[in-house]
Amino acid sequence: MAKLRQRLACLLCAVTATLAGPALASEQGFPFARELMLDVAPMRGSKRVPIIEIAENGAAVIQLWCASTRGQASIDQDSITIVADQVPPTQCDPERQTRDDSLLAALTQVTNWRRQGEVVEFQGATKLRFRLMTN
């Protein structure tokens, strides 16, 4: 009887581990098709904060401080490269334009990424920290 209980306990542990494995992996895998919001305060006079969304095929939508553009991302285990399309002309104040240019340059220089729960960090010349949108 004790051996039967022990076997059932082992079986229960194995089933639980099997079911929990994919959930844990998805918690640490790249969050494709999810909006990633830059972990910074909005600029004075605005509520807008930059957001990037990368589809599983690598298509990227990049919303900067003022302008928006598209691009292509290549993601593999812990490496990432982002190539952004040209930003269409927009009417922005000089401070927002400068911040757009700086952020876009930082995005195109990222080389690695890592995820810890709801936080995704892009690492390169400048570390960029994003939070998963949970709305």
Label each residue range with its predicted role.
Residues 2-5, 10, 18-135:
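Lipid interaction determinants
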